Amino acid sequence: FFTLLLLVAFSVNSYSQNSTSSPYSFYGIGSLDFRGTTENRSMGRLSVYNDSIHMNFKNPASYTGKNLFIFNDEGRLVKFTVGLNYNETKLSSNNQNSLASNTSFDYLGLNLPMGKFGMALGLIPYSSVGYKLESSNDINLIKYKYEGLGGVNKAFLGFAYQISNNFSIGFDAKYNFGNIQNSAIEFLYDDDNQPLDYQSKESNRSDLSGINFNFGLIYSGTIFKEYTLHGSFAYSPSYNLSSINNRTFASVVFNSISGLDFPINQIEVDLESLDLYKTDLVMPNRLNFGLGIGKEKKWFIGSEITTINSSVFSNDLIDIENSKFEDSYLLSLGGFYIPDYASFNKFFNRVVYRTGVYFEKTGLNINDQSINEFGISFGLGIPAGGLFSNINTSFEFGKRGTKKADLIEETFTNIHVSLSLNDRWFIKRKYN
């Protein structure tokens, strides 16, 4: 228990670190960060499959299930999972390239069985902001410099109930919290194209909070005697994030060697008089449906679609020209294969081999160009530390964006590692 508290404290602190270097995190509340657990990501971000030893944050109905009723109903597994992420991105425009990387804490979750009920709690990221951008004038002098960091995280508590052998339902409540900071420096030059002693800087900070809910339904049933049909449905209604905003203007001295700027005079804008001190960000609803088929502890293949009405998103504080949000979707196809789950003399026969592919319309439109993302993934589920615990890995390779209309194309590699710990906490002792 003490170790769990340390992990929670560490994760909250680690969430202050940037997990993205994408220039597209400049828009909205940043790049959507959480795409599922390591297992989900290794199957093309597929979440329709559920089992007794892995958590599924995308559908709260997974917090219980008939596959938890093992050991003659006496030792249902308590599930704990923690994940880490490494990202490397090549940023390419029509005239230059750059490389960026980030390492971050990914997620933390605990799932407790309670008879036909199940309870889960955890901490996951939602969005991340992390960019440094420059724009130049006709003679290649820096005109503007933009920088942003922060993001939104979710702490959740959920419950599920096993209706029958085939159906389970669930819901969770998520508390959203975080902040986003961004700044812009405008560079001015004299007649000899030398930078002036003082430049002007605008800084914005938004502290965000709010609650949203997620509802889920899961089906699992036998067909053709030896195969299992899996179905899932999840819905998250639209909600508002409350934003407390602060804006300052300053004259700064810029050090071209260190890249740091030092404020000389700073003025805080009276946002309250502009009715912008406290604003509400309208967040979209989300609908997810998945279907798959497999043979228990042998193989599985499934597909999934997630739709988001991103066009309703609004932020009164910041209005960026030539950009808008449009409705978005995610298509996933993936699965896994286990050579021999019961093998005890050949280790690699018990390894889970996962792979998948996905396409996402992100919902961001810049200069009349829809920003899309495509990726392939694969990963392993490696038995570790006992019969039920395992280490999971995921490797994602993909592209986001375009070079058209003076935009940026990202080529990225995401590496995820997670630890799934499973144990029997509630066992009825028997004596002869």
For the regions a language model picked out, list residue spans one by one.
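Subset of outer-membrane beta-barrel
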Residues: 17-432
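Bacterial Sec-dependent N-terminal signal peptides
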Residues: 1-22, 432
